[in-house]
Amino acid sequence: KDAEEKIAKVYVLRGKDVIEVPELKAGDIGAVAKLSVTQTGDTIALRSAPIVYHKPKISTPYTYMRFAAKTKGDEDKISSALARMMEEDLTLRVVNDTENRQSLLYGIGDQQLEVTVSKLLGRYKVDVELSKPKFAFRETIRRKVEAPGRYKKQSGGHGQFGDVKMSFEPSGDLETPYIFEEKVFGGAVPKNYFPAVEKGVQECCTKGPLAGYPVVGIKATLLDGSYHPVDSSEMAFKMAATLAFKKGFMDANPVLLEPIASVKVVVPDKFTGDVMGDLNRRRGRVLGMNSDHHGKQVIEADIPMSELFGYNTDLRSMTGGIGLYEYEFSRSVEAPITLLYRKLSFQIIAAIVSHL
């Protein structure tokens, strides 16, 4: 920063007592007050003898909870309060998850998050509620189908008419929501309506018919249709494509995809049995294990993201606070039928089974 900081007094702390001292020598642990520009991680030194230390390595926060204001209208206060707290604590992080419409508070462990909420109430007078986060599930299909979509509305004057026949199949690319193609011959659907048909597909992919999650890995092809020279419109063809999509999707063996994380767990050898057993109970798949240069065991596994909720606390309990872990998103895979039952209504499950 190369900024000047004026320090009037220095102190040492002994329990709850703050004792003013004339100086602090090398090796002393002391305190200063009313710093205007200094933040956590900064180095304070004399201009005549500048000393710059490397910033300390900060542990990556993996524990997170969904948070929300208990009182409507406190959102701005909470945002500014958390910004100040993150300047003090570099392991604290806030993420705005727009996809799932939630705000996430990250920290090193559950206790840190609870202390943060307590500080928000005590210091900044804002009350925050923590809850289990939502996870980024996806929807896709397993087989190719053809489906019609016909939208017709007459209410005096010009009506609305759009008629399409489409095919839907897996694209093989779960990173992309959809691929759109058209194979219409003979002008059955005028070209100027193709973008409206694609728009209908695009909007359907943002909230899938199965459980309301985003759709991925689908190829939609416009095959045929019909139009009316007066009543047809872009809106009518978009609605027709929407009807075709919803019917075709539910006929094409739809499945729910859950996010999978690649996890590395570092523990002393004596805890490996308990840790691996716990990973299996969390529907994890252990990929391998090897020793690091400190003599500890590194367990690598794939595990559903939803099963990592609360893992930090459980790992510390199993290993006496010694175990460490890190993870990153790997891919999405088909969720087991038991999870599907928890996510879907009876009516939707019955509709899926009827098409198997």
PLM segments and residue spans:
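Accessory interaction regions appended to the cores of large information-processing enzymes
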Residues: 1-356
